[in-house]
From Swiss-Prot:
GO terms for molecular function: structural constituent of ribosome; tRNA binding. InterPro entries: Ribosomal_uS10, Ribosomal_uS10_CS, Ribosomal_uS10_dom, Ribosomal_uS10_dom_sf. It comes from Caldanaerobacter subterraneus subsp. tengcongensis (strain DSM 15242 / JCM 11007 / NBRC 100824 / MB4) (Thermoanaerobacter tengcongensis). This is Small ribosomal subunit protein uS10. GO terms for cellular component: ribonucleoprotein complex; ribosome. The lineage of its organism: Bacteria, Bacillati, Bacillota, Clostridia, Thermoanaerobacterales. Transmembrane segments: none annotated. Keywords: Ribonucleoprotein, Ribosomal protein. Involved in the binding of tRNA to the ribosomes. Belongs to the universal ribosomal protein uS10 family. PROSITE patterns: RIBOSOMAL_S10. Pfam families: Ribosomal_S10 (PF00338). NCBIfam families: PRK00596.1, rpsJ_bact.
């Protein structure tokens, strides 16, 4: 019988909230008897936006803004029904995007 695996990908702009959420997921999974691999840090996506400071001319005067998207990967091996139920009831911050694959 093949082993079952749950893969959880977390994304957030703030790395501190992301790490707290990952830690909550890992603690919950371990407490319910599943094996956990991770959190594995994935490459951070850095998006830079350049705009003109002045509304009409002065093209040499520009300003740059950047936004970083931090990502983490968690694999839960051999999850029990209790593990799945506990993960569904877990309350995580609103700034974290969660993608779950079975």
């Amino acid at each position: 019988m093949p082993k079952q695996k749950i893969r959880i990908r977390l994304k957030a702009f703030d790395h501190a909230i992301l790490d707290q959420s990952a830690q909550k997921i890992v603690e919950t999974a371990k407490r319910t008897g599943a094996e956990v691999s991770g959190p594995i840090p994935l490459p951070t996506k850095r998006e830079v936006i350049t705009i003109l400071r002045a509304p009409h001319k002065y093209k040499d005067s520009r300003e740059q803004f950047e936004i970083k998207t931090h990502k983490r990967l968690i694999d839960i091996l051999n999850p029990t029904p209790k593990t799945v139920d506990a993960l569904m009831k877990l309350d995580l911050p609103s700034g974290v995007d969660i993608e779950i694959k079975l």
